[in-house]
Curated annotation (Swiss-Prot):
Topological domains, Cytoplasmic: 1-7, 491-522
Source taxonomy: Eukaryota, Metazoa, Ecdysozoa, Arthropoda, Hexapoda
GO cellular component, one term: cytoplasm
Glycosylation site residues: N44, N67, N104, N166, N191, N228, N272, N314, N343
One Gene Ontology MF term: scavenger receptor activity
Assigned protein family: Belongs to the CD36 family.
One Pfam family here: CD36
Membrane topology listed for this record: Multi-pass membrane protein
UniProt protein name: Sensory neuron membrane protein 2
Keywords (A to Z) from UniProt: Cell membrane, Disulfide bond, Glycoprotein, Membrane, Olfaction, Receptor, Sensory transduction, Transmembrane, Transmembrane helix
Tissue specificity annotation: Principal component of the olfactory cilia membrane. Localizes to the antennal tissue with two to three fold higher expression in males compared to females. Detected at low levels in all body tissues except the female abdomen.
PANTHER family found in the cross-reference section: SCAVENGER RECEPTOR CLASS B TYPE-1 SR-B1 (PTHR11923), SENSORY NEURON MEMBRANE PROTEIN 1 (PTHR11923:SF69)
């Protein structure tokens, strides 16, 4: 009777061991993975959905302005001396409106951003502060004309003197709130013959930074008004219900799956990556070396490179940052050749030097983007200034910390600087003596750090995963011990052969029949 029970115990233990091995190697990981996928996919029933639709905390949107301190000297050919003023801090609220779902596991949506000035974070700075900056809209207009039809530059400049108020030089004295959101008024009601041409082109092109004035006679120029309280998109994004590895991937923007701003080149025109707010979980066995995001402001995808594994809020994270190869010149990265567009100067091939991005094909204005203070850009850009430009990795790089299990962004900052060329044009009085060079207007810092409430949710999830992992291996250990005990019990009961205790005897493996003639000594 005892033997029967022993054999039953052994059989049950063996089955439990097999089941435990299967669960440990495949079952538990699959169950956990499925549950995570269920929670983070973009679905009405998921934990992530409402947080994705309406981000539960404001992002930070900081603006730093380059104030010109030696205007008269620059007007007479001296190097510019700049003073960075900022941050002018804003709270940025984001809300998505779902437009519909596609059959290919996608969701279409628009994104609305709302900016509210944060006086506490801005300290002593005020939106009523007056600064002197490069006249961005004037330089954009005069450069466009000078590149397309140099012979009429002087005539058009006469019209621009009526279009812009007090146009004595290429610098704008302006309140911060007008430069950012409220707008600087420009007048189309003058009597210059070329003014109608200028205003007609503005009405036809409708650049984002120019919005029609209510009086019907002009426009308001501002850098960010088009971003505030307006719907951008629509975007079409993968929901991750069918393939979690594709979660967040943008497959179309404004109905286009390919950005033709850069011609027909597949490398430059493809939409690659997410909108930087959501990423798929990271496979620890195949950690991506690059993290792509689609940036509508520059009409292209950019990537951050993996630096390594780190820690944030006592949780493991992968740290990515913009590296020099992402902003490399054509000579350093031949693949970037398709971003070359002639616009920086009349004699330039449009293949910009290291560290700067051409925005002309994207914004229909000769603007140039870079990292703040020309970080990671060619040092020759720094030689143009007499002071005020000092690139610093800690202050000026773009980076992101990604939690691998859920793909949640623990902390991230996107930094971008807007520049335009200040060009010496002898036929234009305002530009006849100025030195030619790339001139920064301002830079932005946009990002977020998770609030304590969401950090606690993540920590609780990690704790629960730890318990599941412990149970996984505990069950396997118990099954192994039970199987070993039952095997020993069966062996001792004589139901299974065991290793002989006599040191002079031979193993039963080699001698299954100890009494046979094979083992006799002759």
């Amino acid at each position: 009777m005892l033997g029967k029970h022993t054999k039953l115990f052994f059989g049950v233990s063996l089955v439990a061991l097999i089941v435990s091995v299967i669960l440990a190697a495949w079952g538990f990981p699959k169950i956990v993975s499925k549950q995570i996928q269920k929670n983070i996919q973009i679905d009405n029933s998921s934990v992530m959905f409402e947080k994705w639709r309406k981000i539960p905390m404001p992002l930070t949107f900081n603006v730093y302005v380059f104030n010109v301190t030696n205007v008269e000297d620059v007007n007479n050919g001296a190097k510019p001396r700049l003073q960075q003023i900022g941050p002018y801090a804003y709270k940025e609220y984001r809300e998505r409106t779902v437009l519909g779902y596609g059959d290919n596991d996608t969701v279409s949506y628009t994104l609305k951003k709302t900016f509210i000035f944060d006086q506490e974070a801005s300290g002593s700075l005020s939106e009523d502060d007056e600064v002197t900056v490069i006249h961005f809209s004037y330089m954009a207009a005069i450069l466009t004309v000078n590149d397309m039809m140099p012979s009429i530059t002087g005539v058009v400049n006469g019209a621009l003197e009526q279009f812009f108020t007090n146009l004595t030089d290429p610098f704008l004295r302006v309140k911060v709130k007008d430069l950012f959101f409220d707008g600087v008024y420009v007048n189309c009601a003058g009597n210059h013959s070329a003014l109608g041409l200028v205003c007609g082109k503005l009405k036809a092109d409708a650049p984002q930074t120019m919005r029609p004035a209510g009086d019907g006679n002009g426009f308001y120029f501002s850098m960010f008004s088009h971003m505030n309280r307006t719907e951008s998109g629509p975007y079409e994004m993968v929901r991750g219900r069918e393939n979690i590895k594709e979660l967040g991937h943008i497959i179309s923007y404004k109905g286009k799956s390919f950005m033709k701003n850069w011609g027909n080149d597949m490398y430059c025109g493809q939409l690659n990556g997410s909108d930087a707010s959501i990423f798929p979980p990271i496979d620890e066995n195949n950690v991506p070396g690059k993290l792509y995001t689609f940036e509508p402001e520059v009409c292209r995808s950019l990537y951050a490179s993996l630096v390594g594994k780190s820690s944030m809020f006592n949780m493991s994270a992968y740290y990515y940052e913009i590296s020099s190869d992402a902003l490399a010149s054509k000579s350093a990265n031949p693949g970037n050749k398709c971003y070359c567009k002639k616009n920086w100067s009349a004699n330039h091939d449009g293949c910009l030097i290291m560290g700067i991005l051409n925005l002309m094909p994207c914004q229909d204005a000769p603007a140039i983007a870079s990292l703040p203070h020309f970080y990671l850009a060619s040092e020759e850009l720094l030689e143009y200034f007499d002071g005020g430009i000092s690139p610093d990795k800690e202050k000026h790089n773009t980076y992101i910390y990604l939690e691998p299990v859920t793909g949640v962004v623990l902390k991230g900052l996107r930094r971008l600087q807007f520049n335009i060329e200040l060009r010496n044009i002898p036929m234009v009085p305002q530009l006849a003596k100025v030195p030619t060079g790339l001139f920064p207007l301002l830079w932005i810092e946009e990002g977020a750090e998770l609030p304590d409430s969401i950090i606690q949710e993540l920590r609780q999830s990690h704790t629960l995963l730890g318990y599941v992992e412990a149970v996984r291996w505990a069950l396997l250990a118990i099954a192994i011990v039970a199987t070993a005990i039952s095997a020993i019990a069966v062996a001792r009961s004589g139901l299974l052969p065991v290793w002989p205790r006599n040191a002079n005897s031979v193993s039963f493996i080699l001698s299954p029949h100890p009494n046979s003639d094979v083992n006799k000594v002759h």
